[in-house]
Amino acid sequence: DALNPKVMETELSGTNLSFVIPEANQLREFVVIQLDKTIPSISAKAAQMVINQNLHGTEQVDMVIISPLAFKSEAERLQKAHEEKDGLIIRIFTPEEIYNEFSSGTPDATAYRRLMKMFYDRNKDNAKAPKYLLLFGDGAFDNRFLTKDWKDVSENERNNMLLTYQTTESLDMYSYPADDYFGFLEDDSENAIYNYNSNKDEYPTSTATLNIGIGRFPVRTRKQATQVVDKIISYMNNSDLGMWKNNLCFIADDGSNADKYDPVHQVDTEQLTIMLEENKNSK
C-alpha cells in the first residue's frame, strides 16, 4: 500500500540482505534506500521566497527555449536571430520557473513535457500549435549527480545542465535517455518511449509520432554556449546556398562490450541513408 508503507524486518549476512514475506496473489513492491542519499528535509535556512510568475498565462509560441540562468543572454541572442530571420514567436524559460509551475517546485523532467503539452493542447489543430523545443544545456544519465562519474565535474557545470528523461530499465544494454519524450504531446503518447520487456526480450511497438521538433545544445559553460550560438547565427547568415547543404554525414555507435559490439546502430543508420536516397527528390 503506497499510502501505508512499512519497514521490513531484515537480516544482513555479509553483503546479502534478506527478508521473508507470506505468499500472496498480488503484486507487492519493495524499495531499498540509502539514508545518506535521500533528499534532505526542508529547513528554514533552505526555504526561500518564490517570485510570482504565470507561465500558464503565456501567449502561444512557435518555439520554447529552456535555458539555465547562466546561459540566458546567449539564448536571447538566438531568440532574436530566429525572430528576425524566421519570424518565429519564441519564449525563454529557466528550468526553475518550469518546476515551480509544473512539478510543485521539484526538479522533474516531466515538467518540461507538461509545459509543452499546455501549449499544444490549446491549439493542437491549427497554426498556433508549438513547433520547436530547444534544451539549452547538457544532460546526464544521473540527474542527481550521485554517482562517482560526477566527482570531478564542477558545481557550476552541474547547475548549467538540464534534466533528461530516461527509460525505466536500469540495465546497461537497455536503458537510455530520450529527449523525444518531451515531444510526444497527445494524451498517453508519452508511453511511446520504448521500455525493454525482459520477459519477451523485445521492445514494444507504438504508433505515436512526435508533435514538435526537439533539439539540445550539450553545453556546460558560458564559453560553449557563446560558441554554439555564434555558429548557428553564422550558418543562418551564410549566403552560399550551394549543394554542400545537402551533403549529410551519418555517424553510428558501434555498441559496447556489454552487447558484444552489436552493429544494430550501424544497420539502422544504413537504413536511414537508403530511405533518404530513395526519397531525395520528394517534396
Question: Where are the predicted features?
Answer:
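Cysteine-dependent hydrolase recognition
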Residues: 1-283
